[in-house]
Amino acid sequence: CTMNNHNFGCDFGSYHLKIYHRDADAYLIQHNMVAVQDKKGLLAFGDEAYAMYEKAPSNIQVTSPMSYGNLASISNMQAFLRNLLERNIKGQLKGAEYFVALPTEMQERIFTTLIQDSNMKPKGVYLVDKPVAAGLGLGINVKEAQGVMLVDIGAETTEISVLSLGGIVISRLIQNGGRSIDDAIQSAIRKEYNFFIGSKTAETIKKELAYAVEPEQASMQICGRNMVIGLPQMMEVTSDFVYEAIKEQLGIIMDAVKTILERTPPELGVDIIRNGIYLTGGSARIHKLDQLLEQKSGIRVIVDEEPETSVVRGLARVMGDREFRSLAFVTKEQKYE
């Protein structure tokens, strides 16, 4: 009898590593972070490493193996992936097949090499263009002769794409996303109040108080360091303040969407007006962001209910549905029998 080989769908985000395990029909989602200790190597990974972020002593580096949609450290990413799978998957990893979401402008070879050289001995590594996977995850049949526009606002990048016939007609990646919105909140608070907060606190503020248009009246207590007296302190921040702080960053993303719309062939433009613009990625959760995009583009916007996982859900469809299997490809050097 043959051993049942595992199948994995992998979305290597800068903020979360998302894996779909086909055999168990289960998702593994962890912060894409590793903690590496001097002379000792990998100390912790995933959510456990994230808990140490901004709290570790100088001999422990807590970093993400991904940076701005590219791989910052292949060895850290390999160690994380291997450890995560070994910890969660029963049985052999050898002979597994991997379906990996490939971001715009990322070289095809990178992920193939990452997995093949990781001593996990895969049977095959297949790539799916990330916007195509996101479209499938949103429930769109991306193989039709229909123009579909996706705006995927990730942690460090925003990917804006127009799809048709299973491929990317036009796509652009900008280095603005959730992280740059957090940074804008952090620096506005530092400038206005001489008050220093960590990036995790900035992220919490974004989740609670960020509005893209007409903020509702809300506020929260935050903890940080009063830079005048140099001591930790609590202070209150309001939704109005956050609205002003993030306006410019959101504007950059809106302008990039307009640029892509202007470059879209007219026949596909007609489809986009009819079908709407799909908004996904973790920062799609910013309150009323769909309203801002509707105002700026004049086109209705559909927001994914679970925007963080649209890509990995799309990979699950490629793996599970024969109709979409053809959307996966191998890098030119690689041929699997």
Where are these regions (language model features)?
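A structural feature that tracks compact, well-ordered secondary-structure segments
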Residues: E159-S161
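Nucleotide/phosphate-binding catalytic cleft detector across ATP-hydrolyzing
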Residues: C1-L150, L163-I277, A284-V311, A316-E337
